């Protein structure tokens, strides 16, 4: 039987976090944060099954590179306590194979976030073969129609 678990967090400078570091961790990669000059290296981390960046059509193509996407977010958010990203950790059903879990996540992320103008970066981890889960990192602000960030943003209206 599938076990449900979902955890939601905010990545903010006020809590000492970085969107670049969060993305590097979940993608088991090395990324340089232009904002603070720190290199984040998680290339020795194990268990990465799949990773993908999903963008709305108005997003710049270079944001398909997660390092450029999250550095753009870090540059746009100016204050020392800025909210940089929303992060979800979601358990995936062990009953589904890898391709089914990927498809499930892509559909969920597209319908709930990307179609509303948000950029999404996700990775599937399963270190021991018994705990498949996904890390989803989302931009806090959806993009405007012209591919720029809004000056301020207060709420997200969910589709009915």
Language model: regions and residue ranges:
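N-terminal nicking endonuclease/strand-transfer module with a His-rich metal-binding environment
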Residues: 1-156
């Amino acid at each position: 039987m599938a076990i449900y678990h979902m955890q939601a967090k905010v990545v903010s400078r006020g809590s000492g976090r970085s969107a670049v570091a969060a993305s590097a961790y979940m993608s088991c990669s090395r990324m340089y944060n232009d904002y603070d000059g720190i290199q984040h290296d998680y290339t020795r981390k194990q268990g990465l099954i799949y990773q993908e960046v999903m963008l709305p059509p108005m997003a710049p193509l270079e944001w398909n590179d997660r390092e450029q996407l999250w550095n753009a977010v870090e540059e746009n958010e100016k204050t020392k306590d800025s909210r940089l990203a929303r992060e979800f950790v979601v358990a995936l059903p062990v009953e589904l194979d890898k391709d089914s879990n990927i498809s499930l996540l892509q559909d969920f992320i597209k319908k709930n976030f990307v179609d509303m103008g948000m950029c999404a970066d996700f990775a599937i981890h399963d270190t021991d073969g018994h705990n498949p889960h996904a890390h989803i990192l989302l931009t806090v602000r959806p993009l405007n129609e012209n591919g720029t960030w809004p000056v301020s943003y207060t709420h997200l209206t969910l589709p009915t």
